[in-house]
Amino acid sequence: YYREEYKHGLQQNPQFITLSRSFDSYLHPEGFAPLDAAPVSWVGDQDHEWRLDKEGIEEAIRDIIRSGDLGYGVVGSDIGGFSGSKIAPELYIRWTQFSAFCGLFLNGGHGERRLWERSLQELEIIRKFSWLHTELIPYIYSSLTNQRNGGQSLVSSGGGSYQYFFGQDIFCAPIFENSNSRTIKFPKGKWRYLFNPTNVYEGKKTLTFPLDEYPAFLREGAIIPMNVCRDYTGFGDSTSCGKTTLLINPGKTSLKFFVDPDTRKKYSVSVESKKGILIALDGEKPEYILKIIMDNSPLIVLADNQELVEKLEWNYIEADHLLIINPSSVIDRKQFYIQFRI
């Protein structure tokens, strides 16, 4: 059925998209819609509940991770659950946060969905994570391109309890209970907290996340392309609009390939850390801003062997452990070198 519908739709319009069901734990545990007929999927209707036995957010998280492991790409769930009367504020917020790190961000179903009719706290937090999902579209698009070429699924199991990788470089441990506490078993290596990169974790930890925070972490060596146009998330503001923000958490070496979701142009970014940090961009790169997580202020910053002007073309924010490089004629610059104080 799904394959025939999708085939017919494409005959009518080459840009046709259908919403299919990727996973049905009751009837088809091996997967529901065929992968070649599932451009966008959701995991059925959940209730406005937390627990698995009540078909709540726990079920949605489980089924989306299973869908990713089965090879589905763009998958999501009804934020807050589809069925029921009232959506508890804590549940609505946590479900939104989880959905920000899914391929599909879907806000539909029963209950009050007009944020201006809900609490100010819900409006501000849900707005923040809604925009974050939009900002991550360049990363999501490139991750899906990688998956289509035989690479890692956009969502894949990350060990522990309902933990998963979102693309190659983001690790998530969604909150599936009405609690701010989360025990996390981190994958091998060091992981920086996405919303406060001064915090680095490894091994097994029990951490606390207030309602406006969420367990999402950056791999050492991560390079995350983002489209930032507002100041809701903390990753930039309106001055970032029109440029690709490259959020970099340097490791020893990393090489990533990206596809711009608007132009379809391909480019690569490599990072090498030794005495300093060397960043090289190749291909049809977009205009960009570099945001590099660093624990110390640099001595000098070079672009194609020319020293950049501090405060004008680069700035180090000590409180955030973040170096921001926004040089003039940035699209023509191919290589950056960051030298530290000895």
Residues covered by each model-derived region:
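Catalytic-domain carbohydrate-binding cleft regions of carbohydrate-active enzymes
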Residues: 1-212
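Short acidic, gly/pro-rich beta-turn/loop elements at beta-sheet edges
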Residues: 28-30, 182, 226, 287-289, ...
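Conserved, charge-rich beta-strand/loop surface module that forms ligand/interface-binding patches
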Residues: 44-50, 59, 314-321, 326-330
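Short secondary-structure transition/capping segments
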Residues: 87, 116, 241, 313-315
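Short, surface-exposed charged micro-motifs
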Residues: 162, 183, 268, 313-315
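Solvent-exposed beta-strand/loop surfaces of large extracellular or lumenal domains
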Residues: 194-211, 302-325
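Extracellular interaction modules
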Residues: 209-211, 329-337
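Accessory, solvent-exposed terminal regions and/or long lumenal/extracellular loops of proteins
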Residues: 218-306, 320, 327-332, 341
